[in-house]
Amino acid sequence: MLKMNDMDILELALHNQQTAWKILEHTGIIPAWERIGATVHLVGSLKSGLLAKSRDIDLHIYTDTLDIAASFSVMQELAERLSLKEIHYNNLIQTEEECIEWHVLYEDEDRNTWKFDMIHIRKGSKYDGVVERATAAITNRLTPEIKNTILQIKFDVPDGVQIPGIEIYHAVFVGGVRSYEELEQWRETNPLTNSLDWLP
């Protein structure tokens, strides 16, 4: 398998991240949520600079109460205005997560599909700020070497194989994993049972 050098990896990741930022701005998703009084936090790989080849953008959206109608009103506005291909809705209001999940597929002008994970969370609930703290902790521990390792592993994950980014970070920080092959072995014997409880 052809390995990219470190500069290739960084340049490609940076290009993909710049595209993601443009998509985020172009879609106007954050202002759409702010119009219902929500506070929106970017989390995950785009926030930490670890977005590689996946076209995923993660947003955590906070309101004082969870109003299903208000949440749907934002999605209706986005669906009418944007080229959304799929919308998935999960109502977890009555669980300890106290949230509404929206998973949306959006097609950009180049016909690339982007996935927006928008988690609408009640302010003050158990998981308020948890992913934000994890994203910050991961970002703060990144060295150039660790960043390159994580990006290389992400680029080496075969197309069609879904591995949550948090599992890759866990393997690199805790297990000293340095390649996709090592990641596969590590995950077999060191499953990350609750990603929300782990900080690097």
Residue locations for each model-derived region?
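Helical scaffold of the NTase/Pol beta-like nucleotidyltransferase catalytic core
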Residues: M1-V43
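Active-site nucleotide-donor binding segment shared across nucleotidyl transfer reactions
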Residues: I29-F72
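Short, charged/polar surface micro-motifs in flexible loops or helix N-caps
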Residues: D64-A69, R111-N112, K123-K126
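Conserved catalytic core of two-metal-ion nucleotidyltransferases
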Residues: L82-R122
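Short amphipathic alpha-helices in soluble, non-transmembrane regions
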Residues: S71-E80
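Generic structural hydrophobic/aromatic packing signal, biased to beta-strands
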Residues: W33, V40, L78, V104, ...
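Catalytic cores of NTP-dependent nucleotidyl/adenyl transfer enzymes across multiple folds
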Residues: K115-P200
